[in-house]
């Protein structure tokens, strides 16, 4: 075994199975590339990204953990988003939520 090596069973691996995924188009209106990580609260991404932010509240990219999506200047791409799971509390990022996503 190599340090850090991951050995997986044969067959397909399904990420975020049975999650309520949505897709939407996102455009980078800025003049610099923007990279968004797998677990970043998508509603709080860089303001140069243009999309329906309200629809993304409490969601993250539907990609493998530790990976990211890069938006080049002027690029529009379709992304899939899934809801945060677990306690559904968001802290940090741009500070827009700082607590529970779901109101009791």
UniProtKB/Swiss-Prot annotation:
Catalytic activity as recorded in UniProt: urea + 2 H2O + H(+) = hydrogencarbonate + 2 NH4(+)
Enzyme Commission code: 3.5.1.5
Record CDD domains: Urease_beta
GO MF annotations, alphabetized: urease activity
Record keyword Cytoplasm present: yes
Pathway where it operates: Nitrogen metabolism; urea degradation; CO(2) and NH(3) from urea (urease route): step 1/1
Keyword Protease: no
Superkingdom to which the source organism belongs: Bacteria
Subcellular location: Cytoplasm
GO biological process: urea catabolic process
Family statement drawn from the similarity comment of this UniProt entry: Belongs to the urease beta subunit family.
Subunit structure: Heterotrimer of UreA (gamma), UreB (beta) and UreC (alpha) subunits. Three heterotrimers associate to form the active enzyme.
Annotated protein name in UniProt: Urease subunit beta
Organism the protein comes from: Methylocella silvestris (strain DSM 15510 / CIP 108128 / LMG 27833 / NCIMB 13906 / BL2)
Gene label: ureB
